[in-house]
From Swiss-Prot:
Designated gene of the protein: gcvA
InterPro entries in the record: LysR_subst-bd, Tscrpt_reg_HTH_LysR, WH-like_DNA-bd_sf, WH_DNA-bd_sf
Annotation: DNA-binding region: 23-42
GO process terms (BP): DNA-templated transcription; regulation of DNA-templated transcription; response to UV
Superkingdom of the source species: Bacteria
Family, as annotated: Belongs to the LysR transcriptional regulatory family.
A Pfam match: LysR_substrate
Family annotation (PANTHER family): GLYCINE CLEAVAGE SYSTEM TRANSCRIPTIONAL ACTIVATOR, HTH-TYPE TRANSCRIPTIONAL REGULATOR
GO molecular function, one term: DNA-binding transcription factor activity
Any single GO CC term annotated in Swiss-Prot or TrEMBL for this entry: cytoplasm
Domain HTH lysR-type: 6-63
UniProtKB keywords: Activator, Cytoplasm, DNA-binding, Repressor, Transcription, Transcription regulation
Protein name: Glycine cleavage system transcriptional activator
General function of this protein: Regulatory protein for the glycine cleavage system operon (gcv). Mediates activation of gcv by glycine and repression by purines. GcvA is negatively autoregulated. Binds to three sites upstream of the gcv promoter.
C-alpha cells in the first residue's frame, strides 16, 4: 500500500473549502483565486480517487467520503497548530517591537494583545505607534502593520484585514423622529467627517444619492473623534470596519444598512523576509493572522457592487 501523502497545500485548501462550503470564501481566507482553490480540490480528488464535494442547485455540499475526511483532517490540523504553538512558545523569547498606526493599535491590537501575552509569556511586546507610515521597516522594528495597496518591495507582506467604509451611528438614530432606515434617509441627518471630507462624497456617488449635501456636518481631525461623535448621537459617520468593529459588537454603534464602500487599500502585516520564521516573529505572525482571519469570518459585511 502506498505511503504517499497528499500535498499539504491541497489539504489546507480542502479544509477551508469544507468549513465554508464555498470555494469563493475559501479563496478569500487563503488570499488566492477561486480558480486556484478549484485546481487544488481537483488535484486532491484525483490523488484520492474519489469525489469530496457535490453540488445541489447552487449549493456546495460535502460527499459522504468528503465529510468523513474533513472531520479527520480538521482534527489533524488542530493538533498540528497546537503542537506548533507549543514549540514556538518554548523557543520564542525576547523583545518584539511592533510598529503601526495609532488608530489600529488603539481600536484593534491593544484590546486583543492579552491573548498573545498569555500564549507567549516569554515575548515582551513593545508597541510603537507612528503617525506617518514609511515604506520600509525602521532598524529597531521587528514587524509592522502597514496600510495601503500591499506593494512594499523587499519585505514579507501578508494581508491582514480588508478595509470597508460603512455608515455607523448611535442606535438612537434608528428610532428617533427621523428614523435612519435606508441610504436615502441620510439627507435628514448630520454627516460626520474626517479632515478630508472625501469619503461621504465617494459613498453617495457610488449609490447615486445626488440629493444629499455632503458638505454639511462637523469636521474632526482624527478618526477616533469621528467615532466618538457618532456614539454620542451627533450624526452618521463613515467608519473603517476595523476601527468600528468593537463598538458595533458592544452595541454602542450600529450599521443601519448594508451598503458599504469597498476600499482598494487594506491592512498588511510586514516584516523582513529573512526574519519571518524567527521564533518571536513567527509566533506573532501566526497569532495575528489567525486572529484577524477568525474575526473577519465572524464579522463579514455584505455589500452591493
Amino acid at each position: 500500500m502506498s505511503k504517499r501523502l497528499p500535498p499539504l497545500n491541497a489539504l489546507r485548501v480542502f479544509d477551508a473549502a469544507a468549513r465554508h462550503l464555498s470555494f469563493t470564501r475559501a479563496a478569500e481566507e487563503l488570499f488566492v483565486t477561486q480558480a486556484a482553490v478549484s485546481h487544488q480540490i481537483k488535484s486532491l480528488e484525483d490523488f484520492l480517487g474519489l469525489k469530496l464535494f457535490r453540488r445541489r442547485n447552487r449549493s456546495l455540499l460535502l460527499t459522504e467520503e468528503g465529510q468523513s475526511y474533513f472531520l479527520d483532517i480538521k482534527e489533524i490540523f488542530s493538533q498540528l497548530t497546537e503542537a506548533t504553538r507549543k514549540l514556538q512558545a518554548r523557543s520564542a523569547k525576547g523583545a518584539l517591537t511592533v510598529s503601526l498606526l495609532p488608530s489600529f493599535a488603539i481600536h484593534w491590537l491593544v484590546p486583543r494583545l492579552s491573548s498573545f501575552n498569555s500564549a507567549y509569556p516569554g515575548i515582551d511586546v513593545r508597541i510603537q505607534a507612528v503617525d506617518r507610515q514609511e515604506d520600509k521597516l525602521a532598524d529597531d522594528v521587528d514587524v509592522a502593520i502597514f496600510y495601503g495597496r500591499g506593494n512594499w518591495p523587499g519585505l514579507r507582506v501578508e494581508k491582514l484585514y480588508a478595509e470597508y467604509l460603512l455608515p455607523v451611528c448611535s442606535p438612537l438614530l434608528l428610532t428617533g423622529e427621523k428614523p435612519l432606515k435606508t441610504p436615502e434617509d441620510l439627507a435628514k441627518h448630520t454627516l460626520l467627517h474626517d479632515a478630508s471630507r472625501r469619503d461621504w462624497q465617494t459613498y453617495t456617488r457610488q449609490l447615486g444619492l445626488n440629493h444629499i449635501n455632503v458638505q454639511q456636518g462637523p469636521i474632526f481631525s482624527h478618526s477616533a473623534m469621528v467615532l466618538q461623535a457618532a456614539i454620542h448621537g451627533q450624526g452618521v459617520a463613515l467608519a473603517n470596519n476595523v476601527m468600528a468593529q468593537s463598538e458595533i459588537e458592544a452595541g454602542r454603534l450600529v450599521c443601519p444598512f448594508n451598503d458599504v464602500l469597498v476600499s482598494k487599500n487594506a491592512f498588511y502585516l510586514v516584516c523582513h523576509d529573512s526574519q519571518a520564521e524567527l521564533g518571536k516573529i513567527a509566533a506573532f505572525r501566526q497569532w495575528i493572522l489567525a486572529k484577524a482571519a477568525a474575526e473577519q469570518e465572524k464579522f463579514r459585511f455584505r455589500y452591493e457592487q
